């Protein structure tokens, strides 16, 4: 159940299993529905993740000049786009044309056209997230190096819906910050309600364009899907820090990103 009891533009609240957990609320930016700050989350040692360090987002397609200014005023100077080349060629990211912003493309899985699906849709996205952790580890490592190089700015990372590739990235960042898994799962779950209208339109578009009947699980953000990724991360690597070290991210870069997340 979603209950917004905050006057903040950024932080809302989610009640999950009778436990109140703060969850980021979308910024008021036109044409995006899931641009959210990773700040404001409690860590296991009692700290709070910093605001204006990281924004997770869906694609800001057709964004207006006013909302570009909103993002610049928010501090965004680095954008990491996780979409495939096919997606980028089909719909370029308008933020790449802003002179003040450093734009990076780190292609990861395209859930609608990628050969990684072998011509079929997955039963659930949890298996896709595990695949991302295994097969996109190098690009995840590159992304955290980019973040470390932009330590004094707000870093925005996006895919198309801001759910899957962006969700795994957010999971790694929050895990690195020391945020507990329950809070990470709540942050993930919010996407489905934020993007519901968009997802319904995408289902129709994919059917018409590719002739694919997309299962509901592809558009859902049920907690068990990200839980699968967290469980796999912990079993194989232990935590996000060990995962990033295995991805050839330097200890110094990890230290910097941690300092961006928490004091």
Q: Where are the predicted features?
A:
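Ser/Thr-glycine-rich phosphate-binding loops at phosphate-binding pockets of nucleotides
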Residues: 161, 165-166
């Amino acid at each position: 159940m979603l209950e917004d009891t905050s006057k903040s533009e950024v932080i809302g609240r989610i009640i999950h299993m009778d436990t109140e957990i703060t969850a980021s609320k979308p910024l008021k930016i036109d044409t995006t529905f899931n641009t959210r700050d990773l700040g404001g989350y409690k860590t296991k040692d009692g700290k709070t993740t910093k605001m204006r360090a990281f924004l997770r987002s869906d694609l800001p397609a057709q964004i207006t000049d006013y909302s570009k200014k909103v993002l610049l005023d928010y501090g965004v100077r680095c954008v990491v786009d996780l979409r495939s080349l096919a997606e980028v060629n089909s719909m370029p990211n308008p933020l790449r044309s802003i002179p003040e912003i450093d734009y990076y493309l780190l292609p990861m899985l395209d859930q609608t056209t990628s050969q990684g699906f072998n011509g079929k849709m997955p039963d659930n996205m949890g298996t896709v997230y595990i695949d991302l952790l295994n097969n996109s580890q190098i690009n995840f490592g590159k992304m955290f190096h980019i973040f470390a190089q932009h330590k004094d700015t707000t870093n925005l990372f996006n895919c198309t819906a801001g759910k899957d590739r962006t969700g795994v990235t957010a999971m790694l960042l929050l895990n690195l910050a020391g945020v507990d898994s329950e809070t990470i799962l709540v942050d993930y779950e919010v996407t489905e309600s934020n993007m519901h209208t968009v997802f319904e339109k995408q289902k129709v578009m994919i059917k018409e364009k590719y002739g694919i009947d997309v299962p509901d699980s592809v558009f859902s953000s049920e907690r068990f899907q990200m839980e699968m990724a967290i469980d796999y991360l912990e079993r194989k690597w232990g935590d996000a820090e060990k995962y990033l070290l295995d991805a050839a991210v330097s200890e110094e870069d990890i230290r910097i990103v941690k300092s961006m997340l928490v004091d």
